Amino acid sequence: MKRMKRSVSLIGLICLAGFLALAGCAHHGQKTLTGSVEETQILLNFLENERDYFHKGGSFVIGAPDLRTNLLTKPQAQYVIDIRSPGDFAKGHIRGAKNVAFADVYNHVKQINAQSYERIVVVDYSGQASAYAVSLLRAAGYANAISLKWGMSSWAEQFAKDSWLKNLGSARMAAFAQTPSPQKNPKGQLPRLATGKTNAKEILEARLNTLFAEGFRPVMVTDGCVFNAWYCGSSYYVVNYWPTELYQKVGHIPGAVNYTPQETPFKSSTHLLTLSTNGANVLYCFTGQTSSYTSGYLRLLGYDARSLLFGANAMVYDRMKENKVPNTFIPQTEIMNYDFVS
């Protein structure tokens, strides 16, 4: 009998220990949900009501012809930042451009008299990383920041060979669907930010520092990953950022949800809250430039937003040409072959 009581007591202790362990795990699990929606709401209110660069900031790109004209007629009013690697910069760059690593761009701009320039032009290989950088700079209050459309690929063929010309493709034409859009997610909550700040400008500053330090790599995703998400170890909420008529006419990635630009879908009053907060949101446009710019805005708010590299040009290029879709990369008209220095 004593032995039985001892056994029961032992079992009870084991059960109690197990219960406490589970309780401890549950408590630990709650801690992984760091940050708060309130922080995000403070930042969102600021970006929508006081510094709405994303919806009201105008075009974020400048074409090579306009940049060249500005450099010839008013060179002192242009400040060009080239974020390509030092090695590629040395092989050729726009005269007067400063070579700055992506992670250092924000601090670099802080150290110049930014408001004395008409334009702060950010340049990269293809216009995608530069569009992302410009989105962050405009959020910081540098409304004169702008991205060179198509990057150095538009300046001379030498640069396009290893960038845009190398990434045009039509391999996904047969896989593209021409069905109506699936429904958007039901509206949920904002992501949680954990800067520890309570003031909008301080929260924004913390987010800017984090995103510039991370660089563009976490934003990039290829069509190979989107079509074979299992291979990349991810599941994606795919956002097609096109007008509805082109969503069906040109076709779309199967399962992609149409967020038409005309609806300003990334406002809190429209469809912002339908984006996923549990996984990655992959945005794609025609070129990868608008989706990169948009990803900058969404990542500031804590969304895991990613941009599909080179957009539809990398997937259904021939169909884009056939349908004369805007922002199709046409080498004969988009590559200017301007002079450069090395």
Predicted features and spans:
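Bacterial N-terminal signal peptides
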Residues: G12-A21
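Short hydrophobic beta-strand that contains or immediately precedes a catalytic carboxylate
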Residues: L67, Y79-R84, A97-V100, Y237-N240, ...
